[in-house]
């Protein structure tokens, strides 16, 4: 039986005279956007939800600091604080991330330009993006509000997350990473429970992926991501690949399954291996403990262990 052709997503042009999130070419790009969306494999519910979000987004217009009313703080981390806000002109509730940066105007403008790539990242597994702007020393990134919060918040309340739910989390994260990789040549670079968001409709989406190289450099001198979720090759400062995102995803899933971070703190010898420098203190003083699953058996096995991490395409088969 032939596969049913999905219903195309219908997007109406924004009202005359309005700029969509500060980009005057938004209406010109509408046809191209529709074509890209039709390439995605969406079920009917996903299609309708994405269509509704993009239709709302067209009504937002240019984002300005005075147009927001703070409702509550959602969380802080990765160089910024996130607030639940009301966008008064449209009436939409958004999540607004504020990143304080003391940078030159040229760098600031480059960051805003690079963040515009997020306008093209439209997927059921990626948190929606309304726009970004600079005001009073802070970069504002305005996103879809996910009312269920992040999975690290869910984990704190629940203690651990059931296997059945983790299966759905795995599928959503893999599909989100695959979309970023295949459609936009983007690697996430910071997969962890706090960057996986959920909402009351049961959707699971990724946020805070590294699209702006200049923002990454400005925030952390080219060292981005949470160390405890980084793959071994990242800790050593070597190449970054999609396998590094897979490592971080796996570590996050184990943490959510057992209810705690799965790897004990490294001893002095392990720190020396990871960072290539001597650590003060006697490594022999550290009491022996069982090897955590996933850790190398010995230093000689490191290169082989780390180099065989599976590519993301294998998980989608």
PLM feature spans:
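Conserved short submotifs of the Hanks-type protein kinase catalytic core
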Residues: 137-150
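Activation segment signature within eukaryotic-like protein kinase domains
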Residues: 169-170
């Amino acid at each position: 039986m032939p596969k049913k052709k999905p219903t195309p997503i219908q997007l109406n042009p924004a009202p005359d005279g309005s700029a969509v999130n500060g980009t005057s070419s938004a209406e010109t790009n509408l046809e191209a956007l529709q074509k890209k969306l039709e390439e995605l494999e969406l079920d009917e519910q996903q299609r309708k939800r994405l269509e509704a979000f993009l239709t709302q987004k067209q009504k937002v217009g240019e984002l300005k600091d005075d147009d927001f009313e703070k409702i509550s703080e959602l969380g802080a981390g990765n160089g910024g604080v996130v607030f639940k806000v009301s966008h008064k002109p449209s009436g939409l509730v958004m999540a607004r991330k504020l990143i304080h940066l003391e940078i030159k105007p040229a760098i600031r403008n480059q960051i805003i330009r690079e963040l515009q790539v997020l306008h093209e990242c439209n997927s059921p597994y990626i948190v929606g993006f309304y726009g970004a702007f600079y005001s009073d020393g802070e970069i504002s990134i305005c996103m879809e509000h996910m009312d269920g919060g992040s999975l690290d918040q869910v984990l704190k309340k629940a203690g651990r997350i059931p296997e059945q739910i983790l299966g759905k989390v795995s599928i959503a994260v893999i599909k989100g990473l695959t979309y970023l990789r295949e459609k936009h040549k983007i690697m996430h670079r910071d997969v962890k429970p706090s960057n996986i968001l959920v909402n009351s409709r049961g959707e699971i989406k990724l946020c805070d992926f590294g699209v702006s190289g200049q923002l990454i450099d400005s925030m952390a001198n080219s060292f981005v991501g949470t160390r405890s979720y980084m793959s071994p090759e990242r800790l050593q400062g070597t190449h970054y690949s999609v396998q590094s995102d897979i490592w971080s995803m796996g570590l996050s899933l184990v943490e959510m399954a057992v209810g705690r971070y799965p790897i004990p703190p490294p001893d002095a010898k392990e720190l020396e291996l990871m960072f290539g420098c001597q650590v003060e203190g006697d490594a022999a003083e550290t009491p022996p403990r069982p090897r955590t699953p996933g850790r190398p058996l010995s230093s000689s096995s490191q290169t082989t262990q780390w180099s065989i991490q599976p590519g993301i395409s294998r998980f989608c088969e």
